[in-house]
Amino acid sequence: MKPARTDWDSYYARPYRTASLTRKYTASVLVDLLRNHGGVGAAILEFGGANSCFIEQILDEIAPARYDIVDNNQLGLDLLKCRYPRDQRVSVIRGDVLSMHEPERLYDIVFSVGLIEHFDPAGTARAVAAHFSYLRPGGTAIITFPTPTWLYRAVRGLAEATNNWIFHDERPLRLAEFESAIANLGRVESARILWPLILTQYCVVVRKFP
């Protein structure tokens, strides 16, 4: 019987085979968006960023005032702490996006990459809402999630058929579901499909309502 959930310990211990290729592209997209939405000198929060594969490029090219990471996987968080033991800008927090506490601070930018699709529809809506709970009025949310294009379906189907698919609880989303989740939270500023990822993802930028 196939596992019902993704084994994140195994993922962080041994990343998916194509990860290094797709991460470079995603990082370049994120850096451009952060630069264009006030990321320089900003307070940034990454949800689901255990052992973040984007933090190095963002710290180097965007130079935020602070970069906080929230995730519930201890192994991934420990790996990240080892990478940045003395950088005062970086804070690592163990937490669950579905049960976050009242925020101690609000951020200029909150983002996640490939997080909200790992829940049922109600959980996805809650995960999306958490981004905005930690975002200041007028701040920017950047959220990516897989979407079931013909290319995504073909590649995932092949991976599943050959027992190489590891994201067992991944639920590719259509843009309409995401738009419904943010309808009362903010305004979509841009939405595009990142085709070079092969396992295609939407990248959506949302401005929180004032």
Predicted feature residues:
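A short glycine-rich, Lys/Arg-flanked "PGG" loop and its adjoining helix->strand segment in the class I
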Residues: 125-137
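A conserved beta-strand element that flanks and buttresses the S-adenosyl-L-methionine
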Residues: 111
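Short catalytic micro-motifs in class I SAM-dependent methyltransferases
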Residues: 114-118
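Class I (Rossmann-like) S-adenosyl-L-methionine-dependent methyltransferase catalytic domain
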Residues: 1-41, 45-101, 119-123, 142-210
